[in-house]
């Protein structure tokens, strides 16, 4: 599980190339959703690590610590983007911790309803979720 989590974090971080907070947040959200839709079976495993604490708490302490450290890398990246946006006046939100967890929950749920045979492609859904994340921090939506 640790290797899968780290592969997810590395993949998402590699797609976040924007220097300004809004672009980076949009890239992070889109990459998160895209990865989960491209790897739905692994996304189910992540639900255990990111959401179901009771199962993670049953792991040996050394594994729990490594999983928490990997989760922290991802959350620190997201919180860093949120804090940078707040400092620059681009974002407006009440609490960085709650906002970060809300974005993680939002992006982490896309695989539960997505149908690859449906009328929306993965990139379409990823772009919409990037808009949702931008809206959560009261930032402008993308313009088409």
Predicted features by range, described:
Residues 30-35, 72-88, 104-144:
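C-terminal peripheral helix-coil segments that are non-catalytic and often amphipathic
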